[in-house]
Amino acid sequence: MSNYLIGDVHGCFDELKALLAKVNFDKEKDTLWLTGDLISRGPQSLKVLRYARSLGKALRMVLGNHDLHLLAIHAGMRKNNPKDHLTSLLAAPDVDQLMDWLRQQPLLQIDDDLKLIMTHAGIYPKWDKKTAQTCAQEIEVALRGNRLPLFLDRSHTQTPHSWSPKLKGDARLQFITNALTRMRYCFSDGSLDMTHKEIPEKVQDDLYPWFLLPRLLEPEYAITFGHWSALKGKGTPKNIYALDTGCCWGNELTLLHWEEKRYFIQPAYKCENEF
């Protein structure tokens, strides 16, 4: 029984299957963890979603910002951009069932036995484990409720930048969503910067990658995340693992065999501009 953790797939189905073949993944005994953003940009988002859904209990995934964007398109709250390569997915005969399945997925995975946490973007530095769990559950309730379109319509904003336990309503949900699915940089006071995506060496001195700020999270827990392909899996402290290595941009898809702490790489078959 092994736990395999893979970064953002972004519709790169062939690379996903090739990577799983390298480790002889067996859904009857192994567990596949996915950091979110299963879809968009790559050419085979529909196949990725169908495969992920078929894994049943062998899959532990989290939702990413692109997954939430897809739900918003399907709910009629945003427009489909053909460049995202989602048109065939949205026209699929089983799209409603796939979207119902997708909205049931969590934003946070915690395994207390493995001392392992996964989110798409990371863990906000001012949250401990209990706070992160509570906040993620608030978004999950909103996604599964009958006000889904309204939540999705209001969730994709840059503000508020600062966290307070006293945040309420839309502002609270917006901050939590951003922290779990879009966060990269913070200022020293913990407020979010939602504009910069480049590597730390190229940003202003008063910005810090979220994982370099002092954290309230219990130190025995490892954090795995995706979202930030520019890092190329590098520059994180011990026990923090960046797994998005930009397969959809022509780079590679990365798998981490958790028990062995061993990486496996599958180069992209095509670069994004060729899809």
From Swiss-Prot:
Belongs to the Ap4A hydrolase family. SUPFAM superfamilies: Metallo-dependent phosphatases (SSF56300). CDD domains: MPP_ApaH. It comes from the Bacteria. Keywords: Hydrolase. Hydrolyzes diadenosine 5',5'''-P1,P4-tetraphosphate to yield ADP. HAMAP family: ApaH (MF_00199). The gene is apaH. NCBIfam families: apaH, PRK00166.1. GO terms for molecular function: bis(5'-nucleosyl)-tetraphosphatase (symmetrical) activity. Its EC number is 3.6.1.41. InterPro entries: ApaH, Calcineurin-like_PHP_ApaH, Metallo-depent_PP-like. It catalyses: P(1),P(4)-bis(5'-adenosyl) tetraphosphate + H2O = 2 ADP + 2 H(+). This is Bis(5'-nucleosyl)-tetraphosphatase, symmetrical.
